[in-house]
């Protein structure tokens, strides 16, 4: 129901814009990237055009600042639910600022690219109306994402991004068909090869996403009572698809900033930024891949938190065999995360950048190039939803079992 509401809002267009002028920028790489996170909101310039990009950017900044950059944020991160609420409030406030800046930059940039034909009336009031409308839509998307997280299945923001990608999938398939069409005939053999390749890719993603390293955990009291041990399952890709989502978001920021300076397109700094922060160039794709690796390592630590894990084990009188409690346990978990992050990050990077490199050499469609990242996000999110459904099912069955009345009477 929440996704239906989210999708319905795409038909609420922003007043004061010329849709015909916008349609001429359909192949713009920056808008294509942004559309991946909003489900095509830029096609009719709806209030949902920004999607959740501003919120994701704010999350990245706040989480990075927690790493002993701002002591107050670091302290809040250790205060449990109370501290989390404070950090969430900071994230929302930062989302407001980033949303307004991003919306203003996109509006001015599109207006420049269309030679002033994008806005029906070129005045500050129109810019303010458009920017506020886009920012309001971003907050609505953020709120709906939080509702999904609290009451639905999976991470709400990831689910919203996945829904947006799925909406654009028919268009992506159409681009693929155009790419294998010669004259008026479709090369179905080539098309079949691409579909088989996509199927193999999905299988690899499923295997990597579900693979895990099990670290044995022993509880002194439990071992005496039951003789059974527990284990900590560490996935090969610990943070899931978050590195791909965050790297994709970061790549849109420089392009948005450049929209403020379209008049300086001939300057050297403009060309450098445009070259290194766009997915239509080899250098930009390489930077995108390096960002995926960086976020894989970073969010493996953020998600597991070796410090807290070691402290919790000690409080529960549990330990990892052959590893001393305290700092040695922390270092052991840290080493395991680094060990797993190497194959995990390389896999995420290769799946994301190979289609981009191929598309840049044989096709002008960035949508095809983003197919690897899109399939990765969709598959990862659906696997996580499936895992949660399985957990809820087991919980319900367990509850039914406990509520059943048993009698020892004949």
UniProtKB/Swiss-Prot annotation:
Biological processes, Gene Ontology terms: intracellular protein transmembrane transport; protein targeting; protein transport by the Sec complex
Species: Lactobacillus kefiranofaciens subsp. kefiranofaciens
Record keyword Amino-acid biosynthesis present: no
Taxonomic lineage of the native organism: Bacteria, Bacillati, Bacillota, Bacilli, Lactobacillales
Role description: The central subunit of the protein translocation channel SecYEG. Consists of two halves formed by TMs 1-5 and 6-10. These two domains form a lateral gate at the front which open onto the bilayer between TMs 2 and 7, and are clamped together by SecE at the back. The channel is closed by both a pore ring composed of hydrophobic SecY resides and a short helix (helix 2A) on the extracellular side of the membrane which forms a plug. The plug probably moves laterally to allow the channel to open. The ring and the pore may move independently.
GO CC, any one term: plasma membrane
Assigned keywords, A-Z: Cell membrane, Membrane, Plasmid, Protein transport, Translocation, Transmembrane, Transmembrane helix, Transport
Family as reported in the entry's similarity comment: Belongs to the SecY/SEC61-alpha family.
Self-association and partners: Component of the Sec protein translocase complex. Heterotrimer consisting of SecY, SecE and SecG subunits. The heterotrimers can form oligomers, although 1 heterotrimer is thought to be able to translocate proteins. Interacts with the ribosome. Interacts with SecDF, and other proteins may be involved. Interacts with SecA.
Its membrane topology: Multi-pass membrane protein
Name this polypeptide is given: Protein translocase subunit SecY 2
TM region positions: 2-22, 45-65, 94-114, 125-145, 147-167, 188-208, 241-261, 284-304, 339-359, 366-386
Main location: membrane
Pfam families: SecY (PF00344)
Compartment(s) where it occurs, according to its Swiss-Prot or TrEMBL record: Cell membrane
């Amino acid at each position: 129901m929440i996704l239906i509401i989210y999708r319905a809002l795409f038909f609420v267009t922003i007043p004061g814009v010329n849709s015909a002028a916008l349609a001429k920028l359909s192949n713009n790489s920056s808008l294509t990237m942004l559309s991946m996170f909003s489900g095509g909101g830029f096609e009719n310039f709806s209030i949902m055009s920004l999607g959740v990009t501003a919120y994701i950017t704010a999350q990245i900044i706040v989480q990075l600042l927690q790493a002993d950059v701002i002591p107050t944020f670091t302290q809040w991160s250790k205060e449990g639910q109370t501290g989390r609420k404070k950090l969430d409030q900071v994230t929302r406030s930062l989302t407001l600022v980033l949303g307004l800046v991003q919306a203003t930059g996109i509006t001015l940039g599109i207006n420049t690219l269309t030679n002033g034909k994008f806005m029906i009336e070129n005045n500050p009031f129109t810019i303010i109306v458009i920017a506020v409308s886009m920012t309001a839509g971003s907050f609505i998307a953020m709120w709906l994402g939080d509702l999904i997280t609290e009451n639905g299945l999976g991470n709400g923001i990831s689910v919203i991004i996945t829904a947006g990608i799925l909406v654009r999938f028919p268009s992506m398939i159409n681009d693929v068909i155009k790419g294998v069409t010669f004259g008026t005939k479709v090369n179905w053999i080539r098309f079949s090869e691409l579909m088989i390749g996509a199927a193999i890719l999905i299988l690899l993603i499923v295997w990597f996403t579900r693979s895990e390293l099990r670290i044995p955990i022993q509880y002194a009291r439990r071992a005496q009572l039951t003789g059974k041990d527990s284990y900590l399952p560490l996935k090969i890709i610990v943070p899931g698809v978050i590195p791909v989502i965050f790297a994709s978001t970061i790549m849109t920021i420089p392009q948005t900033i450049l929209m403020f300076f379209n008049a300086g397109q001939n300057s050297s700094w403009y060309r450098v930024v445009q070259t290194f922060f766009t997915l239509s160039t080899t250098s930009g794709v390489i930077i995108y891949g390096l960002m995926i690796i960086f976020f894989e390592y970073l969010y493996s630590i953020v998600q597991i938190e070796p410090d807290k894990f070691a402290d919790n084990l000690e409080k529960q009188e549990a330990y990892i065999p052959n590893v001393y409690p305290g700092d040695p346990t922390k270092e052991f978990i840290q080493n395991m995360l680094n060990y797993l992050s190497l194959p995990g990050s390389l896999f995420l990077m290769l799946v994301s950048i190979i289609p981009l490199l191929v598309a840049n050499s044989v096709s002008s469609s960035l949508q095809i190039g983003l197919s690897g990242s899109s399939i990765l996000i969709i598959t990862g999110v659906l696997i996580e939803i499936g895992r949660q459904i399985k957990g809820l099912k087991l919980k319900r069955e367990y509850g039914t079992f406990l509520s059943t009345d048993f009698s020892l009477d004949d």
